Amino acid sequence: MEKNYMTIPYVIEQTSRGERSYDIYSRLLKDRIIFLGGEINDDVANVVIAQLLFLESADPEKDISLYINSPGGVVTAALGMYDTMQYVKPDVATLCVGQAASAGALLLAGGAKGKRFATANSRIMIHQPSGGSRGMVTDMEIQLKETIRLKSILNNIMANHTGQDIKKLEADMDRDYFMSAEEAKDYGIIDKVFSSRE
């Protein structure tokens, strides 16, 4: 299996005391920007949670920006990030660049009200959680109950942030439901579509 290793760019800054180099993500963090790119898993979630907590401790009054380009991933990892976004004192502004699908859409909708954005050509997709199990029937029943419980949690969170009726939301999330940025705005997932910096 071929591994895809991406080169992480470095930025060099000149100061009165000399030069300093940062990897691009650390440089963005200095400006209170967290970039979530790629699939969501426990490792990614732990890094994002740590960044949110660090930025809160650095300045509990100043907004944090979470940029999202994600196809989704592990529901429990996303819920850990979502809960931390709600827990920290600073508002967390969310901005979709590219796509926010599945768990990524949950995080996008979970941004501070009035501070949830998407770029003009972004796509947003919501759906119910997927799961699979194997083994003894009793174990599969346990997994099914847990997946149904997670589905209920996700539906309630999305209904709370979008203002959609829970029955409509459940019907829409029954299968993959794709939206343009404008459609996501009308749906209540975001508050504004950006085409350029203001």
Curated annotation (Swiss-Prot):
CDD domains: S14_ClpP_2
Enzyme Commission number(s) of this protein: 3.4.21.92
Originating species: Brachyspira hyodysenteriae (strain ATCC 49526 / WA1)
Classification lineage: Bacteria, Pseudomonadati, Spirochaetota, Spirochaetia, Brachyspirales
Classification via Pfam families: CLP_protease (PF00574)
Family, as annotated: Belongs to the peptidase S14 family.
Protein name as annotated: ATP-dependent Clp protease proteolytic subunit
The keyword Isomerase is annotated on this UniProt entry: no
Primary location group: cytoplasm
Keywords from the UniProt entry: Cytoplasm, Hydrolase, Protease, Serine protease
Function, in words: Cleaves peptides in various proteins in a process that requires ATP hydrolysis. Has a chymotrypsin-like activity. Plays a major role in the degradation of misfolded proteins.
GO biological process: protein quality control for misfolded or incompletely synthesized proteins
Active site (UniProt): 102 (nucleophile), 127
Cellular component, GO annotation: cytoplasm; endopeptidase Clp complex
Subcellular location field: Cytoplasm
Catalyses which reaction(s): Hydrolysis of proteins to small peptides in the presence of ATP and magnesium. alpha-casein is the usual test substrate. In the absence of ATP, only oligopeptides shorter than five residues are hydrolyzed (such as succinyl-Leu-Tyr-|-NHMec, and Leu-Tyr-Leu-|-Tyr-Trp, in which cleavage of the -Tyr-|-Leu- and -Tyr-|-Trp bonds also occurs)
Complex formation: Fourteen ClpP subunits assemble into 2 heptameric rings which stack back to back to give a disk-like structure with a central cavity, resembling the structure of eukaryotic proteasomes.
GO molecular function, one term: ATPase binding
